[in-house]
C-alpha cells in the first residue's frame, strides 16, 4: 500500500536493502551445502538511495508438487518439513511463513520457497516453529527465550486489544 511507502523508505535507510540481503543469504546458505531452498539467478532493482522502488527476481523453477495440492501429508513428509526448517535455522535463516504453499515435494525431498530475508532472531525462529505446529501439527518441543518472548508479546497485544474493545487475535 502507498501509505507504507514512507515507512519502507525510512526503514530501508536504516536496515538496508531487504531483497539484496535475501539474495546474499540464499547464496551463502547454498554454498554451505543446504540445497533445500530455491536458488536466485538474478536480482535487478531500481533504487532511490537504499529504497527499492521496483525489483525483478529470477528464481529457480522447482519441479514437483506443492504441499497445498496434497490432501494428506504423511508423517515422513512432516518430518522432512520439520528438519528443513530446523536446518534453515542452523544456517542462519528463517522462513517467516512456513505454510503449505511455501514447500514443494521434489521427488523424495522437501524444497522451501518464498523465504524471508529478515534477521533470524530467536522470536522469528520460534514463530517458524509455532507456525509448523499450526499448519502441519508438528509439535514444537523447543521452549527457549524466543518462544517465551513471542508468547508473552502475543498475550500483551491481546490484552491491549481487549482494553481497546477489539477482538483478540
Question: Where would I find each of the regions flagged by the language model?
Answer:
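Histidine- and aromatic-rich ligand-binding microenvironments
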Residues: 57, 65-68, 134-136
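Short, solvent-exposed loop/turn segments at secondary-structure boundaries
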Residues: 13, 70-75, 123-124
Amino acid at each position: 500500500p502507498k501509505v507504507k511507502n514512507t515507512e519502507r523508505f525510512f526503514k530501508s535507510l536504516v536496515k538496508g536493502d531487504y531483497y539484496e540481503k535475501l539474495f546474499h543469504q540464499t547464496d551463502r546458505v547454498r554454498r554451505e551445502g543446504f540445497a533445500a531452498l530455491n536458488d536466485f539467478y538474478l536480482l535487478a532493482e531500481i533504487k532511490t538511495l537504499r529504497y527499492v522502488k521496483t525489483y525483478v527476481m529470477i528464481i529457480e523453477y522447482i519441479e514437483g508438487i506443492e504441499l497445498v495440492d496434497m490432501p494428506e501429508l504423511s508423517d515422513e513428509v512432516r518430518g522432512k518439513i520439520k528438519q528443513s526448517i530446523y536446518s534453515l535455522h542452523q544456517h542462519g535463516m528463517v522462513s517467516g511463513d512456513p505454510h503449505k504453499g511455501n514447500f514443494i515435494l521434489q521427488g523424495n525431498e522437501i524444497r522451501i520457497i518464498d523465504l524471508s530475508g529478515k534477521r533470524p532472531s530467536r522470536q522469528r525462529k520460534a514463530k517458524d516453529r509455532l507456525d509448523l505446529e499450526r499448519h502441519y501439527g508438528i509439535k514444537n518441543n523447543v521452549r527457549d527465550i524466543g518462544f517465551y518472548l513471542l508468547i508473552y508479546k502475543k498475550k500483551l497485544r491481546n490484552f491491549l486489544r481487549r482494553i481497546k474493545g477489539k477482538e483478540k487475535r
